[in-house]
């Protein structure tokens, strides 16, 4: 904070010059910093430190820059926030000029990332909450993409930049430090690798469709409650390389076909094949009819029982049938049902079964009983050995039930658009009696063609799974998503070098001239140097981490030595006291003997 104060303690005139760019007109309220009462630091954004504060008797979040290098990001966020006004975008109250900071709406629920993967205890949430969050995110981004005269690309959509308010029921987009006008078509790679569209880190010109790709990853993340590409690990360029080669998050067991189709379309390698954010809003709005309860506040567990729930973070009672989508290794291998480490989505309320049964009786098309596998009864927090999940399969059955007799609308739609989202396969529901944290899990869909399943060659958990259904001899589906057939994903030698893409924009090699051997040689040399640079930087990071560990161990050793020295001194002091007391005891004993002898002499003489 002292650095931020130093960086922003210049005169108000220089601060005004920094904010008032000649090519833009900013519409914001200038706030006197003396009116703000800072309470605590709550995190960081694309730039600067974010603090919770009081301003005019209400909670606000203030973002202060820490160095001169963050001024550009500050200008970008101030410019973009001053243009927007949407219920799903964080509100800008104004800005301070001395020190330079933004004053924004405060989100008491924290980020979506913390709700999904934060510290214990994690809240329970339903499929309705997950779908509602994605719908609200798409509505906010669609608003950005439709702005006039210049639309905006956020470029850094990810759960840490999505804030929750109103008990976790309302989502707001924040952190516009990397946003740009669509006309800008930036070519650097700001953002986060796990949610980043391939065209962004490949250095190509990109459009608003990069936000669509990020949205698709977020949809997968809120359904599975798992971090995307977490199994890859390592530096960011490892994830970039995998995404470039066609790897996508594994498909989800029992996920209804409409949601799966929308999600995989967003992952398309070709941006033109991805749906627009406006189309996503229409699809999600249509699907939300089958997910009631999104307006109910999130519930946090009051306590954990001693038997199996005290450490819910490691609970692996549920399984998701997922498949790797590394398209460079296609095979006929079915993936094992991988345990979900974050099983936290609560079951739908029991009233859904009543609504479903009523709709089925009205339509006359379906007759599905409330079996144990598809039960949606709410269980109390103290129940043990019960399965707590939101079975997406019954949601799909309700979609079929409510639309089987619906008159189709006029007009036509493109293939794989939401016009044919009701083409649903058979649902297989599995059961498990282990206690665990709740999630949308066990989403297995059957009835697809064999030979379409690929697996990551390094996966340690591969086994064959078959179905017992009498109507099909095909194996249970664990189908990965693959990009267009025309996409080169076999890792050939002509793949672009990816190491330099993780460098800062100014350090990346310029594109060579293909007709010049000298230019190509310089480019290849620069790429090799960039790869070596990244290797050295990684080693430095590991060594620094090891240094910190050794420093911590050294500090602990010093503390242990100090404790040992203190104990030795205390022991020596106690020995001295014992010796002194022993001497005093002997003296007292001698004095007692003298007194007794004197008394005996007196008695003898008397």
From Swiss-Prot:
Association with TAB1/MAP3K7IP1 promotes autophosphorylation at Ser-192 and subsequent activation. Association with TAB2/MAP3K7IP2, itself associated with free unanchored Lys-63 polyubiquitin chain, promotes autophosphorylation and subsequent activation of MAP3K7. Dephosphorylation at Ser-192 by PPM1B/PP2CB and at Thr-187 by PP2A and PPP6C leads to inactivation. Deubiquitinated by USP19; leading to negative regulation of TNF-alpha- and IL-1beta-triggered NF-kappa-B activation. 'Lys-48'-linked polyubiquitination at Lys-72 is induced by TNFalpha, and leads to proteasomal degradation. Undergoes 'Lys-48'-linked polyubiquitination catalyzed by ITCH. 'Lys-63'-linked polyubiquitination at Lys-158 by TRIM8 does not lead to proteasomal degradation but contributes to autophosphorylation and activation. Deubiquitinated by CYLD, a protease that selectively cleaves 'Lys-63'-linked ubiquitin chains. Residues 1-300 are annotated as: Interaction with MAPK8IP1. Its cofactor is Mg(2+). ATP binds at residues 42-50, 63. Its EC number is 2.7.11.25. It is a peripheral membrane protein. Residues 361-375, 453-463 have a biased composition (Low complexity). InterPro entries: Kinase-like_dom_sf, MAP3K7, Prot_kinase_dom, Protein_kinase_ATP_BS, Ser-Thr/Tyr_kinase_cat_dom, Ser/Thr_kinase_AS. GO terms for biological process: angiogenesis; anoikis; apoptotic signaling pathway; bone development; canonical NF-kappaB signal transduction; cellular response to angiotensin; cellular response to hypoxia; cellular response to transforming growth factor beta stimulus. Keywords: Apoptosis, ATP-binding, Cell membrane, Cytoplasm, Isopeptide bond, Kinase, Magnesium, Membrane, Metal-binding, Nucleotide-binding, Phosphoprotein, Serine/threonine-protein kinase, Stress response, Transcription, Transcription regulation, Transferase, Ubl conjugation. The modification Phosphoserine is found at residues 192, 367, 389, 439, 455. GO terms for molecular function: ATP binding; DNA-binding transcription factor binding; histone kinase activity; identical protein binding; linear polyubiquitin binding; magnesium ion binding; MAP kinase activity; MAP kinase kinase activity. It catalyses: L-seryl-[protein] + ATP = O-phospho-L-seryl-[protein] + ADP + H(+); L-threonyl-[protein] + ATP = O-phospho-L-threonyl-[protein] + ADP + H(+). It is found in: Cytoplasm; Cell membrane. The modification Phosphothreonine is found at residues 184, 187. The active site is at 156 (proton acceptor). Residues 36-291 form the Protein kinase domain. Its main location: cytoplasm. One of its GO terms (cellular component) is cytoplasm. SMART domains: S_TKc. Activated by pro-inflammatory cytokines and in response to physical and chemical stresses, including osmotic stress, oxidative stress, arsenic and ultraviolet light irradiation. Activated by 'Lys-63'-linked polyubiquitination and by autophosphorylation. Association with TAB1/MAP3K7IP1 and TAB2/MAP3K7IP2 promotes activation through autophosphorylation, whereas PPM1B/PP2CB, PP2A and PPP6C dephosphorylation leads to inactivation. Ceramides are also able to activate MAP3K7/TAK1. There is a cross-link at residues 72, 158, 209 (Glycyl lysine isopeptide (Lys-Gly) (interchain with G-Cter in ubiquitin)). Can form homodimer. Binds both upstream activators and downstream substrates in multimolecular complexes. Interacts with TAB1/MAP3K7IP1, TAB2/MAP3K7IP2 and TAB3/MAP3K7IP3. Identified in the TRIKA2 complex composed of MAP3K7/TAK1, TAB1/MAP3K7IP1 and TAB2/MAP3K7IP2. Interacts with PPM1L and PPM1B/PP2CB. Interaction with PP2A and PPP6C leads to its repressed activity. Interacts with TRAF6 and TAB1/MAP3K7IP1; during IL-1 signaling. Interacts with TAOK1 and TAOK2; interaction with TAOK2 interferes with MAP3K7 interaction with IKKA, thus preventing NF-kappa-B activation. Belongs to the protein kinase superfamily. STE Ser/Thr protein kinase family. MAP kinase kinase kinase subfamily. Serine/threonine kinase which acts as an essential component of the MAP kinase signal transduction pathway. Plays an important role in the cascades of cellular responses evoked by changes in the environment. Mediates signal transduction of TRAF6, various cytokines including interleukin-1 (IL-1), transforming growth factor-beta (TGFB), TGFB-related factors like BMP2 and BMP4, toll-like receptors (TLR), tumor necrosis factor receptor CD40 and B-cell receptor (BCR). This is Mitogen-activated protein kinase kinase kinase 7. It comes from Rattus norvegicus (Rat).
């Amino acid at each position: 904070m002292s650095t931020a104060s130093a960086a922003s303690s210049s005169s108000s005139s220089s601060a005004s010059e920094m904010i008032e760019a000649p090519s833009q007109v900013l519409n914001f309220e200038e706030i006197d910093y003396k009116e703000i009462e800072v309470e605590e630091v709550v995190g960081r954004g694309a730039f600067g430190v974010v603090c919770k504060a009081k301003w005019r008797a209400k909670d606000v979040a203030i973002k202060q820059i820490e160095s001169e290098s963050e001024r550009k990001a500050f200008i970008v966020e101030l410019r973009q926030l001053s243009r927007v006004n949407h219920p799903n975008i964080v509100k800008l109250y104004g800005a301070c000029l001395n020190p330079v900071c933004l004053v924004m709406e405060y989100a008491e629920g924290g980020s979506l990332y913390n709700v999904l993967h934060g510290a214990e205890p994690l809240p329970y949430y339903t499929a309705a909450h997950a779908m509602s969050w994605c719908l609200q995110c798409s509505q906010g981004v669609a608003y950005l993409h439709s702005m006039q005269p210049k639309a905006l690309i956020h470029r850094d959509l990810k759960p840490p930049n999505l804030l929750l308010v109103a008990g976790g029921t309302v989502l707001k987009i924040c952190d516009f430090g990397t946003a740009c006008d669509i006309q800008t078509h930036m070519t650097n790679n700001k953002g986060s690798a796990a949610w980043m569209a391939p065209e962004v880190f490949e250095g190509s010109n990109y459009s608003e469709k990069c936000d669509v790709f990020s949205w698709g990853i977020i949809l997968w993340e809120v359904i599975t409650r798992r971090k995307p590409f977490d199994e890859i690990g390592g530096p960011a360029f490892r994830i970039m390389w995998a995404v470039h080669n066609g790897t996508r998050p594994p498909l989800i067991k029992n996920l209804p076909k409409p949601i799966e189709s929308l999600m995989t379309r967003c992952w398309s390698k070709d941006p033109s094949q991805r749906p627009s954010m406006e189309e996503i809003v229409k699809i999600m709005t249509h699907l939300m009819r089958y997910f009631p309860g999104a307006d109910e506040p999130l519930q946090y567990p009051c306590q954990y029982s001693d038997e199996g729930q005290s450490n819910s973070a490691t609970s692996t009672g549920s399984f998701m049938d997922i498949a790797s989508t590394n398209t460079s290794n296609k095979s006929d291998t079915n993936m094992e049902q991988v345990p979900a480490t974050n099983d936290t989505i609560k079951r739908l309320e029991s009233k859904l079964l009543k609504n479903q049964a009523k709709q089925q009786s009205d339509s006359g098309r379906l007759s599905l009983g409330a079996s144990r596998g598809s039960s949606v009864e709410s269980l109390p927090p103290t129940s043990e050995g019960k399965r707590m999940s939101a079975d997406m399969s019954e949601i799909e059955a309700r979609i079929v039930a409510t639309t089987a007799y619906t008159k189709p609308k006029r007009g036509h739609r493109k293939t794989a658009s939401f016009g044919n989202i009701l083409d649903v396969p058979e649902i297989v529901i599995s059961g498990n009696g282990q206690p665990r944290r709740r999630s949308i899990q066990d989403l297995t869909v059957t009835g697809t063609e064999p030979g379409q399943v690929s697996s990551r060659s390094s996966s340690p958990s591969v086994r064959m799974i078959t179905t017992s259904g009498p109507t099909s001899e095909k194996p249970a589906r664990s189908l990965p998503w693959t990009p267009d057939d025309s996409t080169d994903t076999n890792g050939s030698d002509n793949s672009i070098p990816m190491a330099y893409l993780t460098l800062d924009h100014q350090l990346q090699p310029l594109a060579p001239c293909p007709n010049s051997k000298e230019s190509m040689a310089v480019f290849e040399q620069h790429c090799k140097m960039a790869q070596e640079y990244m290797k050295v930087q990684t080693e430095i990071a590991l060594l620094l981490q090891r240094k910190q560990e050794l420093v911590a161990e050294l500090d602990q050793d010093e503390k242990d030595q100090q404790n040992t020295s203190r104990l030795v001194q205390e022991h020596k002091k106690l020995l001295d006291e014992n010796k002194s007391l022993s001497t005093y005891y002997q003296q007292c004993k001698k004095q007692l003997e003298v007194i007794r002898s004197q008394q005996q002499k007196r008695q003898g003489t008397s």
